[in-house]
A protein has these predicted regions:
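Extended soluble regions of mature proteins
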Residues: 21-251
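Bacterial Sec-dependent N-terminal signal peptides
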Residues: 1-27
């Protein structure tokens, strides 16, 4: 009963800032669906691509934000969250992944990447130049991902070693999360002992537009990336016994 009351109080407090700021940025021309595996958990992401702007987000986060901010559907989300908490110690797979609450926007026209993120109950906007990892391409190492022939590339990027597979048939310098800068779209990525990402589908028709999502009308504070990482790693910010998922970036 206490758990139910807490969830209701939390969700209703968010409804006080029910969003009006969500807006379309531009039409999309392609959407890549990615499936991620982290420990015993999974998530599903979209890389939605327009002419100038692409966005990367968790489908499950988008659904939670959309339904949770709607007074007509918020109770369904509350019940889902309660069941998830009750099943937390069971061996069932959970919907969970590093930085799953983030919305990332990559603007190729101005060369900037913007990340909308949070640390506990504070919300931040990080703007940086589009990252350019130093890739080593392994021409002799290939694999097929959803029917596309892909070439392997490796890099050490922001504290983690990444191995990715990119497809030159789709000549876009994009990929999941902040991975990109190769002569083809990244369709799979692996960080040993941390995370697996693999494309599950590519959509080309009847696509939603590239959209700035802010259903809760959150007020984001500008912060630089390194200050954010320092703040996010501060254990005093979080309540006791909070289970923390490692961040995508370590440095």
């Amino acid at each position: 009963m206490k758990l139910y009351a807490f969830c209701i109080t939390f969700m209703l407090s968010l409804l006080n800032c029910f969003g009006q700021e969500t807006h379309i940025i531009e039409p999309s021309i392609l959407e890549i669906c990615y499936h991620t595996k982290y420990l015993n958990s999974y998530d599903d992401y979209a890389l939605r691509i327009g002419k100038n702007v692409s966005e990367y987000f968790s489908y499950h986060t988008l659904r939670f934000d959309s339904l949770g901010s709607n007074p007509e559907t918020v109770l369904a989300i509350i019940n889902e969250k309660i069941k998830a908490i009750q099943n937390n110690n069971k061996t069932t797979h959970k919907v969970e992944s590093p930085n799953s609450r983030d919305y990332l926007y990559r603007n190729l026209e101005d060369g900037k990447m913007t990340t909308y993120t949070q640390v506990w109950d504070s919300y931040y906007k990080i703007t940086e130049d589009i990252p350019t990892p130093e890739w080593v391409i392994h021409e002799d190492s290939t694999r097929s991902v959803i029917g596309f022939n892909c070439t392997m590339a490796t890099t050490h990027f922001r504290g983690r070693d990444w191995k990715v597979w990119f497809c030159e048939e789709i000549p876009l310098p994009l990929g999941p999360w902040k991975l990109g800068g190769l002569p083809g779209l990244i369709l799979a990525a692996h960080c040993d002992g941390f995370l697996d990402i693999i494309a599950s589908n590519i959509k080309r028709e009847q696509l939603p537009p590239v959209t700035f999502y802010n259903f809760w009308e959150k007020k984001y504070k500008d912060i630089d990336r390194l200050s954010y990482l320092k703040k996010a790693s501060d254990p005093t910010i979080y309540p006791k016994n909070t289970t923390k998922i490692p961040k995508m970036e370590l440095e």
